[in-house]
UniProtKB/Swiss-Prot annotation:
Pfam family name, one: BRCT_2
Sequence ranges of Acidic residues compositional bias: 454-470, 498-526
Residues carrying Phosphoserine: 453, 457
GO biological process, one term: maturation of 5.8S rRNA from tricistronic rRNA transcript (SSU-rRNA, 5.8S rRNA, LSU-rRNA)
Compositionally skewed regions (Basic residues) per UniProt: 545-554
UniProt entry tagged with the keyword rRNA processing: yes
Protein name per Swiss-Prot or TrEMBL: Pescadillo homolog
Family assignment from sequence similarity: Belongs to the pescadillo family.
Domain BRCT: 321-414
Coiled-coil blocks: 593-626
Length: 633
C-alpha cells in the first residue's frame, strides 16, 4: 500500500483557490463572478487555512472544490464563452464595416436563460418566499434609479413593474402586518403563506450621480438580473393563488415610457403611485372580501394544550380585525406628504385614498368631498379646514397599524409634538433594552405609573419650592415678633411688668418641689412592680441587623465564574465563545448608551418644565404686584 503524500488528502483537497477555479472553468474574472452570483456560490473560510492552501501562508480566496465541479456542468458556462466569440466576430465586422453581417450577428445575440437556476436554487415555493427579503429590497432600490451607464432603462422599468405587481398582491390579499419609518426608508412586513417577508422602500430623493465609484453597480446589476426572474415566478404563483389575472392589466397611460417620463423624474414616480390606486382584474368575476376561516376550539382543544390554542385564536382574531382596520374611512393626502407608503398602507387595510388631481394623476375624489374622514397633512397650519374631518400627521397611520387599533387623533393634530415612533420589530425576549413606551403596548399600566412618577416628581419639586417660600415668610414674621418682645422687655422690665430675677427664683422653688414629689413616688413602688418591669425588659425584641451586600465580592465571584466557564470551553469552540462574549458586551454597551441617552432627555425635559413653571410663577407674581400697586393708588 502506497503511503499518501502530504496535501493529497484531507482539507487540502476540499478547497480550491480562485485562480485555479478560473483555470479549470476557462472563464475570465468578470464571467466567473457573474456565474457565482447567479448560482449562489460564495467563498469559504477553512478551519486551517495553511493546510487548505497546501502549506502557503498567503491569504487566498478559497472555494469548495465540489462547488467548482458543480459549476462545470452549468449550461450558462457555454453561453458566457459564446459572449467572447460574439465580441470578437462583431468587432471584426465593425472594423471592416461589414454592417450587413453585423446586423445578422446582433439578431443572434446569445441570451442567458435563468429559469432552470431559479428552480434549482428554490425547489419549493416556500423556499423562494424565505429568500424574498433581499430580492424586494434591491428591486425597490433599482426601481427608483434613472438610466445609468451600467443600469439600462429597461432594467429599472422591469424592477418598477415587478414591485408594483407585488404591492398589488399585498393590497389584494391584505397580508401587510407591520410598518415602520426609519432613516433608511420605510420598512414593511407581510405574512405570505405563513412566511414573514420584510423589505425596505427607500425615501424618494432626486438621484445624485457619484463622482467616485464607491458602489459597484455592475455587481448589483447581476443580482438584479437574477432577482427579476425570481420575482416574476413568485408574482405569477401569488396572483393565481388569489384568482387574479397575471400580468395585471393597467391603463394604457401607466408604466409606459414617453418623452415626459424619460425627462421628468417626478412624473416617473407619479405613474407608479397612480397604478397602486387602481383595482386589479379577477379571473373568477367575484369581488368579495376573503375572510379567514374561523378556528374550531372544540376540535383543537382535544390536543390538551388549550392555552396555546387560545393564544392562536386570539392572534387570528387580531389579524382579522387588522385586515379591515381602515374599512369605511376615506383619506385625503396633501401634496407635501409622501404618497407611496401611505397609499400602500391605507389600501392594504381596506381604506380609500386620494390626493390633489391638479398636481398628481390618479386621484379618485377631490378635497372638497364631504365624506372624507381624515386628511393627512405635514405642515403647521392650514388656511381652510373642514369640521367634518380630522387633520392628522402621517405618523398616525403607521402607529395605528403597529398597535392594531385606531388611536385617538388628538396627539397627532396639526402642530402637535408627536409621540415617539416605536419599532414593531423589537423582540422582547432577545432585546435587553425596551423603552417605557414599548412596554406600555403590552401593559398600559406601566406608562401610567411612569407618567405618575414624573408628575409626582414635578409636584414634589413645586411643593418644596412652596415650602421654602412659606418657611422664609414664617422666619421673617418670627424675627419681627422677637424684636418687638425684646423691645418691650427692655422698656418695661418684662412683658407683664415683673422683674426677671423674681421669675428665676420662683422657677427654682417650683423645680425643687417637683424633685421631692418624684422621689416619694419612686419609694412607693412595690417589689412586684419591679419584678414585672425586669421581666418585660427580658421579653423585649432585639433589633435586627441589616445584611449589607458587598458589591466588590459579588463582582469578583461573577468574574471567577466567567473565567471558569471560559476554561471549560473546548479548544475548537473558543472562537465561537469569544464571538458570543463580544456580542454580549456590545449589547450591554448599546443598552447602557440608550439608557444614558434616555436619562439625559428626561432630565432636560424636566428642567425645561421647571423653568417654564418658574417663569410662569414670576410672571403671575409680577402681575399680582402690579395689580396691587394699582389698587393702592
Amino acid at each position: 500500500m502506497r503511503r499518501p503524500k502530504k496535501y493529497e488528502a484531507g482539507e487540502a483537497t476540499q478547497y480550491i483557490s480562485r485562480r485555479a477555479a478560473l483555470r479549470k472553468l476557462q472563464l475570465s474574472l468578470n464571467d466567473f463572478r457573474r456565474l457565482c452570483i447567479l448560482k449562489g456560490v460564495y467563498p469559504r473560510e477553512p478551519k486551517h487555512r495553511r493546510r487548505a492552501q497546501k502549506g502557503s501562508s498567503d491569504i487566498k480566496i478559497l472555494y469548495h472544490a465540489k462547488d467548482i465541479r458543480f459549476l462545470l456542468h452549468e449550461p450558462i458556462v457555454w453561453t458566457l464563452r459564446d459572449y467572447k466569440i460574439f465580441a470578437k466576430k462583431s468587432g471584426r465586422d465593425r472594423a471592416i464595416k461589414d454592417f450587413r453581417n453585423l446586423k445578422r450577428r446582433l439578431a443572434m445575440f446569445p441570451e442567458i436563460k435563468l429559469d432552470h437556476i431559479v428552480k434549482e436554487r428554490y425547489p419549493t415555493f416556500i423556499d423562494a418566499l424565505k429568500d424574498l427579503d433581499d430580492c424586494l429590497t434591491l428591486l425597490f432600490l433599482f426601481s427608483t434609479f434613472p438610466s445609468l451607464h451600467l443600469i439600462p432603462r429597461e432594467q429599472s422599468n422591469l424592477c418598477r413593474r415587478l414591485t408594483i405587481e407585488f404591492l398589488h398582491y399585498v393590497i389584494a390579499s391584505k397580508s401587510l402586518r407591520k410598518v415602520f419609518i426609519s432613516i433608511k426608508g420605510y420598512y414593511f412586513q407581510a405574512e405570505i403563506k405563513g412566511q414573514k417577508v420584510t423589505w425596505i422602500v427607500p425615501h424618494y430623493y432626486p438621484f445624485k450621480p457619484q463622482s467616485r465609484q464607491e458602489v459597484d453597480f455592475k455587481v448589483m446589476s447581476i443580482f438584479v438580473e437574477f432577482y427579476t426572474i425570481m420575482l416574476g415566478f413568485t408574482n405569477f404563483r401569488l396572483y393565481h393563488g388569489l384568482n387574479l389575472a397575471y400580468p395585471p392589466q393597467f391603463p394604457s397611460n401607466m408604466l409606459q415610457d414617453n418623452a415626459d417620463t424619460l425627462k421628468d423624474e417626478s412624473s416617473f414616480v407619479s405613474d407608479r403611485i397612480t397604478a397602486l390606486n387602481f383595482e386589479l382584474l379577477r379571473t373568477d368575476k367575484v369581488q368579495e372580501d376573503e375572510e379567514e376561516p374561523d378556528i374550531d376550539m372544540e376540535l383543537l382543544e382535544q390536543d390538551g394544550d388549550s392555552k396555546r390554542i387560545i393564544k392562536m385564536k386570539q392572534e387570528a382574531q387580531e389579524v382579522s380585525r387588522l385586515r379591515t382596520l381602515f374599512k369605511g374611512l376615506k383619506f385625503f393626502i396633501n401634496r407635501e406628504v409622501p404618497r407611496e407608503p401611505l397609499v400602500i398602507i391605507i389600501r392594504s387595510f381596506g381604506g380609500k385614498v386620494s390626493w390633489d388631481s391638479s398636481v398628481f394623476s390618479g386621484a379618485t375624489y377631490d378635497e372638497s368631498d364631504e365624506t372624507i374622514t381624515h386628511q393627512i397633512v405635514d405642515r403647521p397650519s392650514l388656511s381652510t379646514q373642514y369640521i367634518s374631518r380630522d387633520y392628522i400627521q402621517p405618523q398616525w397611520i403607521f402607529d395605528c397599524v403597529n398597535q392594531r387599533q385606531l388611536l385617538p387623533t388628538n396627539k397627532y393634530f396639526l402642530g402637535e409634538p408627536l409621540p415617539p415612533h416605536l419599532s414593531p420589530f423589537v423582540d422582547a425576549k432577545r432585546d435587553t433594552y425596551i423603552p417605557p413606551e414599548e412596554k406600555a403596548l403590552h401593559d398600559p399600566s406601566l406608562i401610567e405609573t411612569h407618567a405618575q412618577s414624573e408628575d409626582e416628581s414635578e409636584d414634589d419639586a413645586a411643593a418644596e419650592e412652596e415650602d421654602t417660600v412659606e418657611q422664609e415668610l414664617l422666619d421673617a414674621q418670627l424675627q419681627r415678633a422677637y424684636q418687638q418682645e425684646t423691645a418691650e422687655y427692655k422698656k418695661y422690665g418684662g412683658a407683664d411688668g415683673v422683674n426677671e430675677d423674681e421669675e428665676d427664683s420662683d422657677e427654682e422653688d417650683f423645680d425643687g418641689e417637683e424633685q421631692e414629689s418624684d422621689d416619694d413616688d419612686e419609694e412607693e413602688l412595690d417589689e412586684k412592680e419591679k419584678r414585672l418591669l425586669e421581666e418585660k425588659q427580658k421579653m423585649s425584641v432585639q433589633s435586627g441587623k441589616v445584611h449589607k451586600v458587598n458589591k466588590r465580592q459579588v463582582h469578583k465571584a461573577e468574574v471567577d465564574e466567567h473565567r471558569l466557564q471560559a476554561r471549560m470551553v473546548k479548544p475548537r469552540h473558543r472562537n465561537l465563545f469569544r464571538k458570543l462574549i463580544r456580542e454580549k458586551q456590545a449589547k450591554e454597551k448599546e443598552e447602557w448608551l440608550l439608557r444614558k441617552k434616555r436619562r439625559t432627555i428626561e432630565t432636560d425635559a424636566k428642567e425645561a418644565k421647571k423653568l417654564a413653571k418658574r417663569e410662569a410663577r414670576k410672571a403671575a407674581a409680577a402681575a399680582a404686584a402690579a395689580a396691587a400697586q394699582l389698587g393702592a393708588k
